[in-house]
Amino acid sequence: MNKAELIDVLTQKLGSDRRQATAAVENVVDTIVRAVHKGDSVTITGFGVFEQRRRAARVARNPRTGETVKVKPTSVPAFRPGAQFKAVVAGAQRLPLEGPAVKRGVATSAAKKAAIKKAPVKKALAKKAATKAPAKKAVKAPAKKITTAVKVPAKKATKVVKKVAAKAPVRKATTRALAKKAAVKKAPAKKVTAAKRGRK
């Protein structure tokens, strides 16, 4: 579709003559060009955004000669299609037979639906993280209990050994004392028997 065809379609939709449709198209184009030239952007909800993009200096090649050519920084006009425009072209949104193809509020509702779809994903990730956390705690707790259980018997064992070692000398001392007493008691008996034999 060229400019003349666009004017013809606009004339039929507006129900006006060709002059008014031509003036409308030319005024819209003129307004967009002047705004973008100033550095402003023209946003048409659902349709897209006309804006100016700055390109930095770069090195390019001449396709014919193959020589490198330095390109100065320039500004170029650009157009970013809107969400509804993209949805209609992609087939995600039905194009109405009558009325405007792009309406207000449709983009906002689509954005809300996208936000609702993204939210459950975050919740699911949070639940997965919550399930992973208890597993780590369960692993750490038994490890600490095992170490304490091992340490306690070790202390008791050392105490038992010390007690046994302390008691052992007492038994030896008592046995020695009893042996000495028995020797003392036996010695006088031998002397008495020897004296009796001398008297006889």
Swiss-Prot record:
One of its GO terms (cellular component) is cell surface. May also be methylated and possibly phosphorylated in vivo. GO terms for molecular function: DNA binding; ferric iron binding; ferroxidase activity; structural constituent of chromatin. The modification N6-acetyllysine is found at residues 3, 72, 86, 103, 137, 144, 156. The keyword Repressor does not apply. Its EC number is 1.16.3.1. The keyword DNA-binding applies. SUPFAM superfamilies: IHF-like DNA-binding proteins (SSF47729). InterPro entries: Hist_DNA-bd, Histone-like_DNA-bd_CS, IHF-like_DNA-bd_dom_sf. It holds the Pfam family Bac_DNA_binding. It is found in: Cytoplasm, Nucleoid; Secreted, Cell wall; Cell surface. Coiled coil: none annotated. Gene3D superfamilies: IHF-like DNA-binding proteins (4.10.520.10). Residues 1-90 are annotated as: Bacterial histone-like domain. Residues 101-200 are annotated as: Degenerate repeats region. One of its GO terms (biological process) is chromosome condensation. Residues 179-200 are annotated as: Disordered. It catalyses: 4 Fe(2+) + O2 + 4 H(+) = 4 Fe(3+) + 2 H2O. Its main location: cytoplasm. Keywords: Acetylation, Cell wall, Cytoplasm, DNA condensation, DNA-binding, Iron, Oxidoreductase, Repeat, Secreted, Transcription, Transcription regulation. It comes from the Bacteria. PANTHER family: DNA-BINDING PROTEIN HU (PTHR33175), DNA-BINDING PROTEIN HU-BETA (PTHR33175:SF3). Binds to human laminin-2. Belongs to the bacterial histone-like protein family. Long actinobacterial subfamily. A nucleoid-associated protein (NAP) that plays a role in local chromosome architecture and chromosome compactation. Required for biofilm formation, stress survival and possibly in cell wall assembly, probably influences transcription. RNase E and HupB jointly contribute to cellular adaptation to changing growth conditions and survival during antibiotic treatment and in the host. This is DNA-binding protein HupB. It comes from Mycobacterium leprae (strain TN).
